[in-house]
């Protein structure tokens, strides 16, 4: 039935009444399972979310596991075929004051409404709810670990939308009802803070959010707000990557010391500076830190430019393609000014220039121009200069006339410090035993550490629970095996199958919403489960540039904290990939 013209509360009650009637006729549910719904009431509809009040955490657990799919299917039918997703709110215990206790008549009325709604008989169409769940994929062949992860993760079963919200002021001051591990508070978040997405309706007028207690009173509870990446349009520097945010240890102390000297301008003998090491160990961070320090601390302000080898290549090719079309300002002159009139040139992933003779020739002359002008040059690579493949000896010798430093995988103490800083940036308190657990299990690089912590934060955010060792164990139980080699083609093929697409759909130029989401998840998993650089991942995905990959990875990481279905997609695919490779 169409209830769009009703107020949010009436619309919710109408849809929920029809939903209960549909579930009542579901022959696959036992009387015991249906009994859990007797005390559930609808509070409001906001966009495509229906807020449901439940009496206790035990009921919530059943609704978000055993009854999750039947509820979503029935809600969609009751909403006229349009997706409607539940957000559950555990109601606080009744206060002892007589004036705040619901009357027996009110309770009886709710129960009567629930019982009287069971009159229609419509079977839910469970296959129409998401692009992914097929009978084959949700049957007994599904890995038990994946099912357990999904069961433990769900708090709001919404495939592509936001966390749970409330449309009214709380009845009691938050300080009187502190947040607990079961989150016995209303789940609230203002709609104004959520970016609009397709299929998501506008917020309700007058929506307000209760004031949470100060963070000092929310020991271990999650506060949204992950620090983002901001790239300066002129320098291309990420303002978040500074020496202050670079955690040093035995594995990178020398590299940081030399990098700081170059940034200060005192390390003239360190020109050029070559930083090498494996993926995800902090090379790019040091490049940005050098640039940010120089810009912020030196007078006059130096001209700084950070680029990847891919960007350098693309700029040169574009300058050749358009050269001569602008007689007053030829394209090549623009290229020369951009790269040869800077005071500090920072170039990342230099190894990808190997074998590109024309590009290397241009870089050779750019290097000489800057070096002869006593300008600073810093390059980063995955190998030391003498191991660069398909580079001319004359260029390698110029790299080696400065200083070469390496960054190694961080030790345990450094990994713990990195995790603590990441937690602070996400405004979440993480107990030391959790930091130790993650640091002990993920030892290869910083990217692994960050990925593991993000999964834990996402779980805490979705369930509105504090971060504990138990939650961390449950969240990461399928990700502690890190010695499995995953190929990007395996990831793409698995993601394509998962979303009922083809390999070519994922790597091709198509941009339908379903394909774009699958492609972004595949990019995120490739970044998370391999040591490939952003540029190399972009090449695998149809020749896309590294900024596209970077955006996709950040987008999925952010949405995992907001949208239950995105979180489930990533978790299930990770489990399936490791399960497949271990078979």
From Swiss-Prot:
ATP binds at residues 280, 282-284. It is found in: Cytoplasm. PROSITE patterns: DNAA (PS01008). Keywords: ATP-binding, Cytoplasm, DNA replication, DNA-binding, Lipid-binding, Nucleotide-binding. Residues 126-135, 147-174 have a biased composition (Basic and acidic residues). Residues 1-91 are annotated as: Domain I, interacts with DnaA modulators. It holds the Pfam family Bac_DnaA_C. Plays an essential role in the initiation and regulation of chromosomal replication. ATP-DnaA binds to the origin of replication (oriC) to initiate formation of the DNA replication initiation complex once per cell cycle. Binds the DnaA box (a 9 base pair repeat at the origin) and separates the double-stranded (ds)DNA. Forms a right-handed helical filament on oriC DNA; dsDNA binds to the exterior of the filament while single-stranded (ss)DNA is stabiized in the filament's interior. Belongs to the DnaA family. This is Chromosomal replication initiator protein DnaA. The gene is dnaA.
């Amino acid at each position: 039935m169409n209830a769009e013209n009703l107020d949010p509360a009436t619309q919710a009650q109408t849809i929920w009444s029809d939903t209960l009637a549909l579930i009542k006729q579901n022959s696959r549910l036992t009387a015991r399972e249906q009994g859990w719904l007797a005390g559930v009431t609808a509070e409001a509809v906001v966009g495509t979310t229906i807020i449901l009040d439940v009496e206790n955490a035990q009921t919530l657990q059943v609704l978000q596991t055993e009854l999750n799919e039947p509820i979503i299917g029935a809600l969609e039918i009751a909403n006229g075929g349009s997706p409607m997703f539940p957000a559950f709110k555990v109601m606080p215990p009744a206060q002892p004051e007589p004036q705040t206790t619901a009357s027996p008549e009110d309770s009886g009325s709710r129960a009567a409404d629930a019982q009287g709604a069971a009159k229609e008989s419509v079977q839910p169409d469970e296959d129409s709810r998401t692009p992914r769940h097929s009978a084959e994929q949700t049957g007994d062949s599904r890995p038990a670990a994946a099912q357990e992860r999904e069961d433990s993760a769900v708090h709001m079963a919404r495939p592509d939308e936001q966390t749970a919200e409330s449309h009214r002021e709380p009845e009691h001051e938050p300080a009187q009802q502190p947040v607990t591990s079961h989150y016995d508070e209303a789940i609230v978040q203002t709609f104004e803070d959520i970016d609009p997405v397709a299929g998501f309706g506008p917020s309700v007028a007058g929506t307000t959010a209760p004031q949470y207690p100060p963070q000092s009173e929310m020991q271990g509870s999650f506060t949204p707000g992950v620090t983002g990446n901001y790239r300066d349009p002129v320098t291309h520097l990420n303002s978040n990557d500074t020496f202050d945010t670079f955690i040093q240890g035995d594995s990178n102390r020398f590299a940081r010391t030399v990098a700081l000297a170059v940034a200060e301008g005192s390390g003239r003998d360190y020109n050029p500076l070559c930083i090498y090491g494996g993926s995800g160990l902090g090379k790019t961070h040091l490049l940005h830190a050098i640039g940010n320090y120089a810009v912020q601390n030196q007078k006059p302000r130096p001209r700084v430019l950070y680029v990847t080898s891919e960007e350098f290549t693309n700029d040169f090719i574009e300058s050749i393609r358009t050269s001569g079309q602008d007689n007053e300002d030829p394209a090549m002159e623009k290229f020369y000014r951009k790269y040869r009139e800077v005071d500090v040139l920072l170039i990342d992933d230099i190894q990808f220039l190997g074998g590109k003779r024309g590009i290397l020739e241009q870089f050779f002359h750019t290097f000489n121009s800057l070096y002869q002008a006593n300008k600073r040059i810093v390059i980063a690579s995955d190998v030391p200069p003498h191991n660069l493949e398909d580079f001319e000896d004359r260029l390698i010798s110029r790299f080696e006339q400065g200083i070469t430093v390496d960054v190694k995988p961080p030790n345990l103490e450094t990994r713990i410090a990195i995790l603590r800083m990441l937690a602070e940036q996400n405004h979440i308190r993480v107990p030391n035993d959790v930091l130790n657990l993650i640091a002990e299990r993920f030892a290869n690089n910083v990217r692994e550490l960050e990925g593991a912590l993000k999964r834990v934060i996402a779980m805490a955010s979705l369930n509105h629970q504090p971060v504990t060792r138990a939650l961390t164990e449950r969240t990461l139980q399928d990700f502690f095996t890190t010695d499995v080699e995953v190929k990007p083609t395996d990831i793409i093929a698995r993601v394509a199958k998962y979303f009922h697409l083809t390999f070519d759909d994922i790597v091709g130029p198509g941009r339908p919403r379903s394909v774009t989401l699958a492609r972004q998840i595949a990019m995120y998993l490739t970044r998370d489960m391999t040591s490939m650089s952003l540029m190399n991942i972009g090449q695998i995905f149809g020749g896309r540039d590294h900024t596209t990959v970077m955006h996709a990875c950040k987008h999925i990481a952010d949405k995992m904290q907001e949208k239950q279905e995105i979180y489930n997609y990533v978790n299930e695919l990770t489990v399936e990939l490791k399960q497949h490779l271990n078979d």
